[in-house]
């Protein structure tokens, strides 16, 4: 498996484009084939999520996706649902598709009616620009950005020639439970919808569900996975693990980019938890660490306050014993042990620790010494800018 350029347009049979002339943007992705989806577990659900979930569960295939940024079309009642349907119908009519095979996604401010006239005005330009170049993938990725500072796309080619690519957006309001978080993934493997669904759920659980920026689960979270089947390669039973691994690789890349691009963030935090008795325990501890405001604040201040890490692990609800804990911080290729088997380490190099804390990526390694299970979670520091961005979001 190798990383390749091109984002979603690296996948055979995918064309895309997007524009963002102001606060609102529009992206369209044209790719036909079996499809699967994972959606927010928030009980307040945006209209596009309701519509797209119904279509995935009924049709198990997609021909296109239309996404807008700048307005979430959430908490907008029946009118919002009709607006989402109209968006799908406009794409279907212009491209000669069945509207039931067009998914809709939105991201932005909650509780405001979507300006459908904006979609009508600019959709022709987007459809005219549809193409399969790397620039077209980037244009679509840029169009769905809100408070994101960096474009998020990733693609790999498996040894068998199958390609998997995805674009995503997300920087705030991220704690997916399948953070706002949208992802559109594509492959050219010749696989049915049930295989896509199984691979998607595994990959999302290991990656996007392990990202925490601010602990808020959005009304609009959505991950869609479509196969164009254009490679002609049907992964055999022996290759399905490679297929799932490829999707996990793409999603891990995007998950880390989301965490690093958290609103106002200056540092990526990666919590690696090992030695858990159960996988769920490892997940709980890792996510609790990166969710902790005290840990996030300490990382922002370059303060190696490891007590906050063990405290977070302790209240996570996971099974652990403090006498067994071993903790270290690492970054920039260096590592300092802080706790060993429940005792404060006497080998800590404070000058090296200070150097590690100055890195823009900090890894927290915690061994529970209870078993063999492990998990990794990603988050970011909590900064003054996070408060400013979210205090001024609608004003």
Curated annotation (Swiss-Prot):
The active site is at 180 (nucleophile). Gene3D superfamilies: ArgJ beta chain, C-terminal domain, L-amino peptidase D-ALA esterase/amidase. Its EC number is 2.3.1.35. It comes from the Archaea. GO terms for cellular component: cytoplasm. The record marks 107-108 as: Involved in the stabilization of negative charge on the oxyanion by the formation of the oxyanion hole. It is an enzyme of class 2 (transferase). The record marks 179-180 as: Cleavage. PANTHER family: ARGININE BIOSYNTHESIS BIFUNCTIONAL PROTEIN ARGJ, ARGININE BIOSYNTHESIS BIFUNCTIONAL PROTEIN ARGJ, MITOCHONDRIAL. Heterotetramer of two alpha and two beta chains. This is Glutamate N-acetyltransferase.
């Amino acid at each position: 498996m190798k990383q390749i350029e091109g984002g979603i347009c690296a996948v055979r049979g995918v064309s895309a484009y997007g524009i963002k002339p102001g606060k609102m943007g529009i992206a369209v992705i044209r790719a036909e084939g079996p499809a699967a989806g994972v959606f927010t577990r928030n009980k307040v659900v945006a209209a596009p999520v309701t519509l797209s979930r119904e279509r995935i569960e009924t049709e198990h295939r997609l021909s296109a996706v239309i996404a807008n940024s700048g307005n979430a079309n959430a908490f907008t009642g029946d009118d919002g649902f009709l607006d989402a349907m109209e968006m799908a119908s406009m794409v279907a009519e212009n491209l000669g598709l069945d509207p039931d095979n067009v998914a809709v996604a939105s991201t932005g401010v909650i509780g405001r009616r979507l300006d459908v006239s904006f979609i009508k005005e600019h959709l022709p330009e987007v459809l005219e620009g549809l193409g399969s170049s790397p620039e077209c993938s980037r244009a679509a990725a840029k169009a769905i950005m809100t408070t994101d500072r960096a474009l998020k796309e990733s693609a790999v080619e498996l040894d068998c020639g199958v390609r998997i690519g995805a674009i995503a957006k997300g920087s705030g309001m991220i704690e997916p439970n399948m953070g706002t978080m949208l992802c559109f993934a594509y492959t050219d493997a010749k696989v049915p919808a049930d295989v896509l669904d199984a691979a998607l759920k595994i990959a999302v659980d290991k990656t996007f569900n392990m990202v925490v920026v601010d602990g808020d689960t959005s009304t609009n979270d959505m991950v869609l996975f479509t196969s164009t089947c254009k490679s002609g390669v049907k992964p055999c039973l022996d290759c399905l693990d490679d297929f799932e691994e490829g999707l996990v690789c793409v999603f891990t890349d995007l998950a880390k980019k989301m965490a690093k691009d958290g609103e106002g963030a200056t540092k990526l935090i990666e919590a690696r938890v090992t030695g858990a008795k159960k996988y769920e325990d490892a997940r709980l501890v890792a996510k609790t660490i990166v969710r902790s405001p005290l840990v996030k604040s300490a990382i922002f201040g370059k303060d190696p306050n490891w007590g906050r890490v063990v405290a977070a692990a302790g209240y996570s609800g996971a099974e652990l014993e403090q006498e067994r804990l071993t903790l270290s911080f690492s970054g920039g290729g260096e590592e300092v042990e802080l706790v060993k088997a429940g005792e404060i380490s006497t080998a800590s190099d404070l000058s090296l620790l200070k150097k590690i804390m100055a890195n823009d990526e900090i890894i927290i390694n915690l061994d529970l010494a209870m078993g063999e299970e492990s998990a990794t979670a990603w988050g970011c520091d909590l900064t003054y800018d996070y408060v400013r961005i979210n205090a001024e979001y609608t004003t």
